[in-house]
Amino acid sequence: MTASNPLRDESQTRPGGQPLRGAHLDSTAQLMNAITSQLGSQLSLVSLDGTRRPVPPPLVLVGHGSRDPRALSTVRTLIERVRELRPHLSVHLGHIELNEPLLPDTLASLDPTGEAVLVPLLLSRGYHVKRDIPEAAAAVPGLRARVAAPLGPHPLLVETLYARLVEAGWRTRMSDAARRASGVVLAAAGSRDPEAAVDARRTAQLLAERLGVPVVPAYASTAAPTVPAALRAMAARGRHRVAVASYFTAPGRFATECAEAAPWISSAPLGTHPTMARLILHRYDQALATQATTEPALASA
């Protein structure tokens, strides 16, 4: 008996055993795409005069972590969008808690004598931005780390919030009567840090200017007012068409609870909106323009 060839894919042959010409086209195309992508990344680091540009420090996106599997999926997709915008940039993920890889493990995998820019996937100042992330960076001997500002407040975040509200049914044009009856509750996670509340109020102010209706921040935990309390206050002022704007980076328990409290419409979390990837790179570039330090930068436009 003649042994069969275990490498032959019988589904890719003509009757009689002759291989199809296109049998390996898919794998060849994938290989060529990979080579082209790698070559493009290498060429992007070479200037017009042929000299090689310095390799930019890796970007470490620091997520909070969540028990909701949708959150991890969202963050991974967001990282892919960042890589698409800047293919030559090395982008890594590290979590503060709950999900792997944890931030200390990610930092330990980097060149201990190199540089890194840590961009918090967080929307305001608070304990994680001020303590947890800088301490994790400082714990790696020799690593020259910069901690970027949190994502908010920033006009790009406001544009993302606006887009999510429109997706949920917010009318971009409304009568004066409808405008007088409308409002928005900006639903955030909450923090004991007073600067986090300052940042949330600033985002609410920017969103109010964008929408032309009152916007008040409210919180899922820890801080006041709660989302239900803010909704009641809006109703007491005659605002009965009130939307809940989800000020969360990804789906999770808090985002779900806040959405369920909405008397009218509620928007999806910020998620993988294209503007989010642009904002992450903006914070990265801002941090690169400052002296290397593990102290978090101040949020600014």
Describe the role of every protein-language-model region.
Residues 1-301:
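Active-site-proximal alpha-helix that buttresses catalytic centers in soluble enzyme cores
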